[in-house]
């Protein structure tokens, strides 16, 4: 723990399942902070996977110039369906792959696949459109983009404006936790042990626990909506930290001003944003 950490003895609320929150918990612990882990959303495969399965078959047949992956979950959905269909998920030699950020790139490399494009600066749909040289060159291409049921239209509209033929298919659904285990996007894993001071928080206990929290980390617009469904009027002392611009925009649309927005959509990005906001406007830990 850093002795001078402004985060010491403060607690951040993480709205993810414990396994996915583990890295953020570890990073907070290194800086002397604690975490309350409260899973509000879950991810399911579509009840009808025929469209996804057909898109997967076309991908494996080499029908697309590009595969666009905007989250680790989209890759998980492809892997799940490939396994269910007894297929090997591999990227054809003639298909290039674009990813939104480092987490998705790392998951892709675990498959032994390459990453042909990832934005350097803005790890978002907007950043992809701004930095994608082949897209900006204007030469038409075919794209497969599996995505969430609540994904924004940013990439779809960007492809259409540049004459690219985008085949968009729903790969997974975002639902309140817990989701249907029969449609689970991945096999549940045991919750990791949490360090001293950090704890699991059941969603129904969130309103009563809010006074003991110092910050909330929002990792998607849907986490904003599900949090506010449980706690419509967050206490004024809570620092609302957004993982990116679209999440910050959702907070503002709901009448709340983010205390900070992460420069990078990573655990360190969120924690750094929170820390910088505290240094700018110091408050005693609650």
Labelled PLM ranges:
Residues 1-286:
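Conserved beta-alpha
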